[in-house]
């Protein structure tokens, strides 16, 4: 069929009254699904720690499986976000091109029908949308940091771990010498709710640092030899210290059970 014989135009500009429907066109929001999956991974890590005997030599294989799943999920999420951004750009470009076209009316109908005037076609733009570049996972999350250090602090909750600039790196950590104290330097008691400073990375228990900063907007960091000035809003939850303390308590409990059992055997 010749173009002039088309009974209706191939495409026409977006009608002003259809803007509401056009606005509602979007990629499906999968953010809640991804957050649920991440939550399940965090729960799996907690279950692994809770259900594994502290005397177990290593949990590297289980951690590697969870890490692989987490990285795959993170990549899918990045691809989903990238697709969503492409759809937004597509709609923006389509709207701009459509708005530049003469509106469809009795005087322009035949011109659009014959092809003398043309308007963008959303379906064609979508089919010709550039393929997104391979997505990269988010590589600096608390969960990835925990997965990276878990095999090491499982064996020794007090081991010194280097700063994790890129926890997604496949290289093994080079564990440093020395020991990490699992007691707050302010309260001198075991951590209950450890908070870490985003300025200097020093850790204090919530009650301790709150009492130290009470009545002050800012104050010198209470850690000896630290030159930073801190405020309460500089502190965030420290999941790695929480994990250290949890594993240390489990190991101590097992040691107490072992000593009690040995005492009974002696009797």
UniProtKB/Swiss-Prot annotation:
Keywords: Cytoplasm, DNA damage, DNA recombination, DNA repair, Metal-binding, Nucleus, Transferase, Ubl conjugation pathway, Zinc, Zinc-finger. One of its GO terms (cellular component) is Smc5-Smc6 complex. GO terms for molecular function: protein serine/threonine kinase inhibitor activity; SUMO ligase activity; SUMO transferase activity; zinc ion binding. Coiled coil: none annotated. Its main location: nucleus. The keyword GTP-binding does not apply. Gene3D superfamilies: 1.20.120.1010, Zinc/RING finger domain, C3HC4 (zinc finger) (3.30.40.10). It is found in: Nucleus; Cytoplasm. GO terms for biological process: chromatin looping; DNA double-strand break attachment to nuclear envelope; DNA repair; double-strand break repair via homologous recombination; protein sumoylation; regulation of telomere maintenance. Zn(2+) binds at residues 200, 202, 221, 226. Pfam families: MMS21_N, zf-Nse. Its EC number is 2.3.2.-. Belongs to the NSE2 family. Acts as an E3 ligase mediating SUMO/Smt3 attachment to SMC5 and YKU70. Acts in a DNA repair pathway for removal of UV-induced DNA damage that is distinct from classical nucleotide excision repair and in repair of ionizing radiation damage. Functions in homologous recombination repair of DNA double strand breaks and in recovery of stalled replication forks. Present with 2800 molecules/cell in log phase SD medium. This is E3 SUMO-protein ligase MMS21. It comes from Saccharomyces cerevisiae (strain ATCC 204508 / S288c). The gene is MMS21.
């Amino acid at each position: 069929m010749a173009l002039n014989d088309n009974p209706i135009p191939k495409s026409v500009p977006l009608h002003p009254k259809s803007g509401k429907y056009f606005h509602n066109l979007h990629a499906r929001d999968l953010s809640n699904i991804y957050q649920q999956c991440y939550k399940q991974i965090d729960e799996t890590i907690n279950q692994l720690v809770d259900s594994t005997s502290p005397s177990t030599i290593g949990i590297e294989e289980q951690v590697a499986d969870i890490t692989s799943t987490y990285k795959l999920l993170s990549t899918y999420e990045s691809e989903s976000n990238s697709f969503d951004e492409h759809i937004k750009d597509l709609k923006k470009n389509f709207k701009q091109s459509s708005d530049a076209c003469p509106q469809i009316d009795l005087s322009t109908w035949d011109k659009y029908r014959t092809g003398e005037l043309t308007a963008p076609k959303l379906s064609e733009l979508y089919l010709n949308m550039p393929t997104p570049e391979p997505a990269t996972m988010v590589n600096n999350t608390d969960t990835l940091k925990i997965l990276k250090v878990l095999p090491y602090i499982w064996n020794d909750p007090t081991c010194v771990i280097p700063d994790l600039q890129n926890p997604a790196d496949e290289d093994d950590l080079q564990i440093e010498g020395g020991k990490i104290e699992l007691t707050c330097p302010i309260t001198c008691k075991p951590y209950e709710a450890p908070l870490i400073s985003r300025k200097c990375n020093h850790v204090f228990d919530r009650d301790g640092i709150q009492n130290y900063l009470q009545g002050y907007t800012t104050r010198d960091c209470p850690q000896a030899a630290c030159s930073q000035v801190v405020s309460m809003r500089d502190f965030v939850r420290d999941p790695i210290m929480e994990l250290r303390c949890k594993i240390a308590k489990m190991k101590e409990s097992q040691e107490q059970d072992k000593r009690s059992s040995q005492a009974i055997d002696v009797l």
